[in-house]
Amino acid sequence: SAAYVGMAVFITGGKGAGQYGYVNTYNAGTKVATIKKYSDNSDGWEQIVSGRAIEAALDNTTVYSVEPRVVVQAPGNDGSTATSTALCRAKVADGKISEVRIIHPGSSYTTAPTVTFTDPNNTADAPLETFIGDGVLAQPAFTSRGTGWTTLSATIEDVGQEKDITGVTFTANPYAEILLTAN
């Protein structure tokens, strides 16, 4: 199933807070998803907070959010080279992207980058314009908010050697397996 493939997963509270990645594969029958890093598409989580260790085993304090993934790509074929690409989160309200929160603005942009949203469930895209200022990405301006965007959240229950986050399972493997269920 492609229900959540490409969507962002942010751990927003408790153990592992600040970790993020995106859904690479999702099995609707088992509700198992694999997580990849934004930076290099390898298996596992990244951490928003510089220097904070990645938590391999989460517990019943962990809270996460699945939301449209925002990808900011450096412009191509124009001589510009972003030395660091931006990291953003899409805020969804009433099924529409209401804002894009810039967590890290990136650096060394000489022209505005391309921004894409990934949510296999959306029914209308959310086109926007990007701007740069002093070589960093500025807040975008929407021309339409789109419709049908999805978010969900989960709670965690402790289950022996594994941690079950209302269907989210983390194992000793170097990547996370997440079981997703919509609210």
Regions found by a protein language model. Give the residues of each.
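Short beta-strand-centered aromatic/proline hotspots
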Residues: 18-26
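Short, solvent-exposed secondary-structure boundary/capping segments
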Residues: 27-43, 98-101, 178-180
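Short solvent-exposed strand/turn elements
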Residues: 34-61
